[in-house]
Regions:
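Active-site donor-binding segments of glycosyltransferases and PAPS-dependent sulfotransferases
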Residues: 29-125
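A charged, aromatic-enriched C-terminal amphipathic alpha-helix characteristic of glycosyltransferases
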Residues: 98, 342, 359-389
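Membrane-proximal helix-turn-helix segments that form the acceptor-binding/catalytic region
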Residues: 154-186, 194-195
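Conserved acidic donor-binding segment of nucleotide-sugar-dependent glycosyltransferases
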Residues: 279, 332-333, 337-346, 354-362
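Acidic donor-binding loop of glycosyltransferase active sites
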Residues: 291-303, 316
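Short hydrophobic beta-strand element within catalytic cores of glycosyltransferases
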Residues: 297, 317-322, 330
Length: 393
């Protein structure tokens, strides 16, 4: 049987995060697939290539940037927006967002592919208007800043930002709703995201949790658990590191904050001597912290959340709010505990109670690590390949 011709569509490769890791696994699932993204930076391109190369051989090709090495491995097709992104300094991509939907609708997909798989955050589903082939959307989340007013206010950073996001949000909602009926199938990265797809798009979704590179994170029984809790991740408002700080203060514990971001300065103003900020750190430092901490704190609502799975792979329990992706990953009493989701005061009080009485010896690190293994990339590739094959007919 001839292998299907697959196109993969992503909104931008300007950094490497969880959604880019998903695309890397898509490429491993369908070797030779063409990859399209309106905005591609050199850093984003190289990070994707490195991630794919870690699992297969083949040199990259970057179409539209400088070096055309077609046929040698990965073919990434970008657009004029890459050059515009570089011209404005290669940093923020937000000024270019209004141009992304139209660019996606004009992708050269017609009559070239048997199935198109899009990696969607806000606009990728616009690719349905560029092809008659079945389009399957892997949804990291419908655009939360477009649909969720509280999230938008939290992330906007002031009235001007809120007004700008409100305008762009109206645009994004219309774009998502226009594309939704044309999708052949929707895959959500968690049950929480599937609920959003149902509520906002009016569509059912199959849940396939994203891959986590747990091979980099393993337990070490020879390392004793120490007397501190860990928050790891980007320091941006929706991650709610502020609640972790307040909960540890209330419980009289110690906290290590690993990560950096625009919210760090504010967090340092509310933290006391109980909190240590280590900034951004390489994997070997993160691994060491996962192995040594009493537990990892997850006070924010994530669409999925990679950090809890990495922590569990190292045998660390996770204390998380009972909402969002944590409902897919944390098993109370076995791999961690839930804090009832509510207002900030309720979350702080609930997490402080868990911290105050927390005993890591109640948990089996080996069992926690085995549970994390269910999110391995190999499991993801098998599941996503099966779902897409059935949906594409």
């Amino acid at each position: 049987m001839t292998a299907p011709r697959v196109a993969l569509v992503h909104e931008r490769f300007t950094e490497y995060g969880g959604s880019e890791a998903v695309v890397a696994e898509f490429i491993k699932t369908w070797p030779g697939a063409a990859v399209f993204a309106p905005i591609v930076s050199r850093e984003g391109h190289d990070s994707l290539v490195a991630a794919v190369a870690s699992g297969r051989r083949g040199a990259p090709a970057h179409d539209g940037a400088a070096d055309d090495a077609a046929g040698q491995g990965i073919s990434i097709h970008d657009s004029w927006l890459s050059r515009a992104h570089a011209a404005i300094g290669g940093g923020a991509h937000a000024p270019l967002l209004p141009f992304v939907p139209r660019t996606l609708r004009r992708l050269p997909l017609a009559e070239r592919f048997d199935v198109v798989v899009v990696s969607h955050h806000a606009f990728a589903t616009q690719a349905v208007f560029a092809t008659d082939a079945p389009v399957i959307a892997y949804v990291h989340s419908p655009a939360r800043w477009a649909w969720d007013g509280a999230f938008r206010a939290q992330e906007a950073g002031g009235k001007p930002g809120q007004l700008a996001l409100a305008g762009l949000g109206h645009f994004a909602r219309r774009a998502e709703l226009r594309a939704a009926p044309r999708l052949a199938h929707v895959i959500a990265n968690s049950h929480a995201v599937a609920d959003g797809v149902r509520d906002w798009w009016g569509l059912p979704a199959t849940v396939v949790n994203p891959p986590v590179r747990i091979d980099r994170f393993t337990p070490d029984p020879s390392i004793p658990r120490e007397d501190f809790f860990l928050f790891a991740g980007r320091l941006v408002p929706y991650k709610r590191a502020d609640l972790a700080i307040r909960a540890v203060q209330r419980a009289g514990g110690r906290l290590v904050v690993l990560g950096d971001g625009r919210h760090r300065q504010y967090l340092e103003t509310i933290a006391g001597s109980e909190t240590t900020f280590l900034g951004a750190a390489p994997d070997h430092v993160l691994l060491d912290m996962y192995r040594r901490c009493r537990a990892v704190l997850m006070p924010g609502v994530e669409d999925f959340g990679i950090v809890p799975v990495e922590a569990m792979a190292c045998g660390a329990p996770v204390l998380a709010v009972a909402a969002g992706g944590a409902l897919d990953t944390v098993r109370p009493g076995r791999t961690g505990e839930y804090v009832e989701f509510g207002d900030d005061t309720a979350v702080v009080e609930g997490m402080a109670c868990l911290i105050r009485d927390f005993d890591p010896s109640r948990y089996d690190p080996a069992a926690i690590s085995r549970h994390a293994g269910t999110f391995a990339p190999t499991a993801f590739r098998a599941r996503i390949g099966d779902v897409v094959a059935r949906a594409a007919g």
